């Protein structure tokens, strides 16, 4: 059984009324990035579900602390 992991995800979207792509960082806990899709969509409602993942990584350490 896979344990849930902490993901740091860079989201991109071009919300209505914007001329250039915007970005935001999303943190979520799940078994995969795909599992976090509903939370990512809810996190950025102005994008109306039209978001994409530019980058992500699993957070395993913060400072001297293991995650």
Language-model features and meaning:
Residues 32-48:
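A short, charged, amphipathic alpha-helix used as a generic interaction element across diverse proteins
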Residues 21-31:
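A short, exposed loop/beta-hairpin motif centered on an aromatic-Gly-Thr core
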Residues 1-22:
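Short aromatic-glycine-(Arg/Gly/Cys) micro-motifs in beta-strand/loop hairpins
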Residues 11, 25, 41-43:
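A structural feature that tracks compact, well-ordered secondary-structure segments
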Residues 8-10, 33-35, 66:
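Domain-level signal for compact, non-enzymatic binding modules
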Residues 14-16, 33, 61:
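Generic structural motif
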Residues 44-67:
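Short, mixed-charge low-complexity intrinsically disordered segments
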């Amino acid at each position: 059984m896979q344990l849930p992991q902490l993901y740091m995800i860079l989201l991109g979207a071009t919300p209505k009324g914007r001329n250039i792509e915007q970005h935001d960082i999303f943190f979520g806990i799940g078994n995969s990035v795909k599992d976090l899709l509903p939370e990512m969509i809810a996190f950025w409602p102005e994008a109306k579900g039209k978001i994409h993942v530019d980058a992500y990584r699993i957070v395993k350490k913060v400072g001297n602390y293991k995650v």
